From Swiss-Prot:
InterPro entries: Lipid/polyisoprenoid-bd_YceI, TTHA0802/YceI-like_sf, UPF0312/YceI. It comes from the Bacteria. The lineage of its organism: Bacteria, Pseudomonadati, Pseudomonadota, Gammaproteobacteria, Vibrionales. Belongs to the UPF0312 family. Type 1 subfamily. One of its GO terms (cellular component) is periplasmic space. Disulfide bonds: none annotated. The keyword Signal applies. The keyword Signal applies. This is UPF0312 protein VIBHAR_05924. It comes from Vibrio campbellii (strain ATCC BAA-1116). Keywords: Periplasm, Signal.
Length: 189
């Protein structure tokens, strides 16, 4: 009896650290509850805003151990949309992001740091225009919980600035960088 009780206790003790693993989520693009947006200077006089309409990804999030969290995203660069067809055609061309040649951009996190009060630093490798560089996204945990359809969700926002020259994207005038704004909501798998 004592051996059996000891074995059961040992099994529970071993399993406990693994029972609190990160929860896995798929980014909800089907329900349009996520967006990848950009803002770039237009000749130094104003800003052009747009988005990527097609992307997919997933993330793991462990509220108790943020360092175990991760995110992976694939963006269809041909889906760039600034609400102006001719401009979009030009931005997608070889003059800028060359979406015909580089139809995907990817982000794979390598490190997530808890900065306190729901703030996160998400560092990872961004591949854009055929070039892979490390970037850091300043993110914020918005919330998590049950949805009305019986599922579980978690949401984040994030911002980062990309220097176009870092990704060998031609710079035109004052447009040397693009600001990215991310709204990510995931549905638990």
């Amino acid at each position: 009896m004592k051996k059996s009780l000891f074995a059961t206790g040992l099994a529970i003790a071993i399993a406990l650290p693994f029972g609190a693993n990160a929860a896995d989520y798929v980014i909800d693009t089907k329900g349009a509850h996520a967006s990848i947006n950009f803002k770039v200077s237009h000749l130094g006089y104003s800003f052009i805003k747009g988005r990527f309409n097609t992307f997919s990804g997933d993330f793991s999030f462990d509220e108790k151990n943020i360092a175990d969290s991760k995110v992976n995203v694939v963006v269809d660069t041909t889906s760039l949309d600034s609400n102006h067809a001719e401009r979009d055609k030009h931005i997608r061309s070889g003059d800028f992001i060359d979406a015909g040649k580089y139809s995907e951009a990817t982000f794979n996190s390598t490190k997530v740091v808890d900065k306190g009060n729901g703030k996160l630093g998400v560092t990872g490798d961004l591949t854009l225009h055929g070039v892979t560089k490390p970037i850091t996204i300043e993110a914020e945990f918005v919330g998590a919980g049950n949805d009305p359809w019986g599922g579980e969700r978690a949401g984040f926002i994030g911002q980062t600035r990309l220097e176009l020259a870092d990704f060998e994207i031609p710079v035109m005038g004052s447009s040397s960088y693009v600001d990215m704004e991310l709204h990510i909501e995931g549905v638990k798998k």
